């Protein structure tokens, strides 16, 4: 989905938000419906659930997540946080609902129900996604020339590296929960709790960027949450209490990242340039989203005998996630202090 950000940006510029979101909604439902008839064929699932659904999701997500930037000037971060928060809240609900559907029906009917739900919700919703009347599309033009600017390159590298650990926790939380003796059903509920923390982080991060600390300071704090929770808390999470602390702080940090990057671009590159830069930046995140979790999984598989799982088997993956977050943080800190060296300033 994220790899289509540039194409989605072009589609929005040519077709508008409504038609782009409508096209995405149709493709998402179609991909799930067709996948329901091919549950035993990996190649067909790759095409239907991977490609068709992925293209539709890319079009929908881009339309939904960038439209608020056209409407809001003062509270952009909060607007983005509410939109992205809806996504993580949906993930919390659907993780439990999908698990129940698979248990009580089967995979095929789960795909079909999800497809009909996507059509029933996303198609009507697409008609409400519009840009302000009289607003021009000139600032939607992709600003490829930014690659000549050192500050933009630092933003690209810093945020791209920071993407590597973002989806490691939701992949490992069910596995880690089962290693602590919980059932599969409880593990899914624990994953939903992480998604709820992510929802809070997305909304709270946007509010913090707009009102309290500023976008850059908020992004620094967000990456600290991700890095320290992975390096310090997760490796010691041998009890439910410590694991809960990890779920809360890591979920808040991972969620806030998504709502903080757009206002951070506005603070560093100019608010009027955000929509011309954001599709390019999001496309560069593909490597982190695609390779981050498989690398962590490979590290975990090399950690020891997985038949007798304990906290120590997960520590290398946790250290990897935390280290990648802190490396990304160093780039953001450099950008922050090139803006101003004063510590107690909202930026």
What is the meaning of each model-derived region?
Residues 50, 57-72, 79-80, 169, ...:
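Intracellular juxtamembrane helix-capping segments at the cytosolic ends
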Residues 74-75, 82-133:
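Helix-loop-helix hairpin linking two adjacent transmembrane segments in secondary transporters
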Residues 100-116, 298-327, 342, 346-347:
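A membrane-interface helix-boundary motif in multi-pass transporters
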Residues 3-43:
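Conserved MFS/SLC helix-loop-helix module at the cytosolic interface between two early adjacent transmembrane helices
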Residues 3-17, 201-214, 300-301:
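Helix-to-loop junctions at the C-terminal end of transmembrane segments
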Residues 148-209, 215-217, 257-258, 262, ...:
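Extracytoplasmic gate region of multi-pass secondary transporters
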Residues 268-312, 321:
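A late C-terminal transmembrane helix in Major Facilitator Superfamily
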Residues 19-33, 216-232:
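Structural signature of the two symmetry-related core transmembrane helices
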């Amino acid at each position: 989905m994220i790899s289509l950000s540039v194409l989605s940006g072009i589609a929005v510029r040519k077709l508008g938000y409504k038609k782009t979101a409508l096209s995405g909604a149709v493709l998402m439902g179609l991909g799930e419906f067709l996948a329901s008839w091919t549950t035993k064929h990996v190649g067909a699932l790759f095409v239907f659930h991977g490609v068709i659904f992925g293209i539709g999701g890319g079009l929908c997500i881009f339309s939904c997540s960038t439209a608020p930037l056209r409407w809001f000037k003062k509270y952009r971060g909060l607007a983005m946080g509410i939109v992205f928060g809806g996504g993580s809240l949906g993930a919390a609900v659907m993780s439990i609902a999908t698990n129940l559907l698979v248990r009580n029906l089967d995979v095929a009917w789960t795909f079909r129900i999800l497809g009909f739900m996507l059509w029933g919700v996303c198609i009507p919703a697409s008609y409400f996604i519009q840009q302000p009347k009289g607003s021009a599309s000139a600032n939607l033009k992709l600003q490829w020339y930014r690659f000549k600017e050192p500050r933009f390159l630092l933003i690209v590298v810093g945020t791209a590296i920071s993407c590597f650990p973002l989806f490691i926790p939701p992949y490992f939380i069910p596995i880690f929960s089962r290693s602590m003796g919980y059932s599969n059903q409880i593990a899914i509920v624990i994953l939903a709790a992480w998604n709820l923390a992510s929802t809070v982080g997305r909304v709270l991060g946007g509010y913090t960027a707009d009102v309290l600390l500023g976008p850059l300071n908020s992004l620094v704090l967000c990456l600290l949450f991700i890095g320290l929770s992975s390096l310090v808390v997760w490796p010691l999470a041998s009890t439910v209490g410590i694991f809960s602390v990890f779920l809360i702080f890591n979920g808040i940090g991972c969620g806030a990242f998504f709502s903080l990057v757009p206002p951070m671009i506005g603070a560093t590159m100019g608010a009027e340039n955000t929509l011309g830069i954001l599709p390019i930046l999001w496309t560069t995140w593909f490597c982190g989203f695609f390779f981050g979790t498989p690398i962590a999984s490979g590290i975990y598989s090399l950690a020891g005998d997985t038949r007798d799982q304990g906290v120590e088997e997960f520590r290398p993956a946790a250290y990897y996630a935390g280290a990648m977050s802190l490396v990304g943080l160093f780039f953001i800190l450099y950008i922050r202090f090139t803006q101003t060296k004063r510590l107690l300033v909202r930026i």
